[in-house]
Amino acid sequence: MNQVRKWNIIGGRVIKTGIAVFLTVLVCEFFNIPTIFAVITAIVTIEPTATDSIKKGLVRFPASTIGSAYAMTFTFFLGHQALSYALAAMFTIVTCQKLRLHAGTLVATLTAVAMIPITADHYFTAFLIRLATTSTGIIVSTVVNFFILPPHYVKTISGCTEELFVKTANIMEEWLTALMDGKVIIKETTYNLSKLTVLLHKAVQFVQYEQKDWKYHRHTKKEMRSFLLVQKQLHLLQQIIYHIDNLARAPIETCDWSQNEKEILRRTIHSIISILRNHCEEIDEEHFKLIDELDKQFWTNKNDLAHCKPNQYHHHFSSKSIILFEVLSIHDMLEELKQIFEKYESENQLNCSVH
């Protein structure tokens, strides 16, 4: 399993930041303008996607313009006093928020307070120079983010998806152990489930990043199919994790299973674990037989509950029915995952035969 590298110190974004800073300084030195504000802007303009760099760059430029204008105005009237810093920061923040320039508020405020101590006269000229340095930082960073090491998250998403399959299977195994022992879910399982949810959200975020830049870069049909596959897999894994979370919250200790019921459930869960670890590429006939047995159990429990008197039971589902329902729901997701994988494989084979 190719897991996502957790300790990758120098990634593409770090390298691009260094390149952007280097080029920004060269441009500033060529035009003989101050470098510090251009460098600050260049650093914050490097975003996870080129799309975000462009969008936020268009926000940060007017925001920095506002900050520079306030800084020069208050310095002109009040000089280098504490009140000038405070008013420049306050007015910059309020104006940016009112104009919905949220992405540029921080940079604009830093620009405003940093300009005050280094400007003694020629305020309008200093203001124009600041616009030039800000523009330089934004343009250089956007160009670097767009053309140098453009973000490609498909491999990262695939790694996250593989890890999700394995970790989902592991949590199912932990839950099965608790079920067989008739004990409450331990804290470690709950913690692992929360970590699994974090990993899922991370993978979904990478999908969103990839979609944002999809229109700017060329992709082969195979890459597009791979991306659509992992996107659909993540959507279904999200539903599986939701059902597992419900299983973890089900009151296991109140269930009264017969030996036969317990054995069928155990074998079914083991089969689900095996399928997940195999990335749902194959589901054997034995698994479907177990699901049929489980389905019969579910409806038997549901019908038995329907005959209970109101004063004996007030819930529509017993603990056993809830557990069976969640397991059957997980099976439905596994079937969908298998169909998606089969479609992906058939399209790949068809494409290979054409070429």
Curated annotation (Swiss-Prot):
Annotated membrane-spanning segments are 19-39, 74-94, 109-129, 131-151
InterPro entries tied to this protein: ArAE_1 (IPR010343)
Keywords of the record, alphabetical order, are: Cell membrane, Membrane, Transmembrane, Transmembrane helix
Q: Which topology term describes how it sits in the membrane?
A: Multi-pass membrane protein
Provide an example Pfam family for this protein. ArAE_1
Q: What is its main location?
A: membrane
The record's GO CC annotations read:
plasma membrane
Its localization reads: Cell membrane
Family per UniProt? Belongs to the UPF0421 family.
| Entry protein name | UPF0421 protein BA_2743/GBAA_2743/BAS2557
